[in-house]
From Swiss-Prot:
Function: Binds to photoactivated, phosphorylated RHO and terminates RHO signaling via G-proteins by competing with G-proteins for the same binding site on RHO. May play a role in preventing light-dependent degeneration of retinal photoreceptor cells.
GO molecular function: G protein-coupled receptor binding; identical protein binding; opsin binding; phosphoprotein binding
Tagged with keyword Phosphoprotein: yes
Keyword line: Acetylation, Cell projection, Membrane, Phosphoprotein
Pfam families, sorted: Arrestin_C, Arrestin_N
Modified residue annotations for N-acetylmethionine: 1
Protein name as it appears in the record: S-arrestin
Modified residues (Phosphothreonine): 230
Stored Gene3D superfamilies: 2.60.40.640, 2.60.40.840
Entry comment describing in which tissues the protein is expressed: Detected in retina, in rod photoreceptor cells (at protein level).
Amino acid sequence: MKANKPAPNHVIFKKISRDKSVTIYLGKRDYIDHVERVEPVDGVVLVDPELVKGKRVYVSLTCAFRYGQEDIDVMGLSFRRDLYFSQVQVFPPVGASGATTRLQESLIKKLGANTYPFLLTFPDYLPCSVMLQPAPQDVGKSCGVDFEIKAFATHSTDVEEDKIPKKSSVRLLIRKVQHAPRDMGPQPRAEASWQFFMSDKPLRLAVSLSKEIYYHGEPIPVTVAVTNSTEKTVKKIKVLVEQVTNVVLYSSDYYIKTVAAEEAQEKVPPNSSLTKTLTLVPLLANNRERRGIALDGKIKHEDTNLASSTIIKEGIDKTVMGILVSYQIKVKLTVSGLLGELTSSEVATEVPFRLMHPQPEDPDTAKESFQDENFVFEEFARQNLKDAGEYKEEKTDQEAAMDE
């Protein structure tokens, strides 16, 4: 008789307040924006009834946009803008209890009677988590969009930031991410031609990709066809992957960064042609110390990548999206001049494409892992980044003891 295959372990992320009054549990750190809908943040809060006696416990979701270093104050101008804030009271429960998710039901069963569920939703107009990579020598916070979940206990009905006791609160970063749509667009292709002085016929360039969407880490084959009907020599063919980042909220900053490049060894003499495929792989690993590269929002420095292409729901105002990211292939040809190297000219054309994550597993399949309550609890890691100043918390007694 064939043994049943055990259900896979499901990692549950948890974080506890310094005074041990509040512990928050989340089933994941990344929440998927499907364009038409966004996965809600469903989790639970475990409270110590003695420590929260007479208090209220809240959970909040904040989306914030930062532009540059917040420690630089110019005429009172704030370099942070909250794009969205939502808050729910979880203890004591208010109103009729809503439906719980399968994850919440399993956690309540495992953690006991002092566990309270919460559900926070994203509106459809919010940007995804993204940040511009600071240079190694930069200090302070860099430009980016991030999402923060906070759970806290307080006596006060006024839950302003400066009135929340830090020892009774926990803060953690999550990410809102997009994955590639299931339907591909048309195969990207571009053609261009140039007429040169003293040449009757043009130089033609055709560039094509095998598909519209590539996944992070996937090789991108670029087919280049050069038809040189001129009297000049095409001395160099260079293919680039360019990341185009547009900061649209506070300004109209526009960054174009090359994140991968390849060069053909062949030249194309007058009245000849060449077709060649060059393969490029844009990776963060090759761009880690370059300032201004857009990244998917960071939770831990080792688990991020180049920012995914932005997909905007129809009808949404682009200016509230914070940072827009797109990608293009650029092919540059260097053409000889009358005086050789001194008068060489460059011509180029671009082909847009999308760089994204593949679709995750079927949600119904993922839910099966909850049925046996096979949870593995993992402490929610604090940011290990130079730009983590705002999220840096005082150490717990246990952490302090470990440092001694």
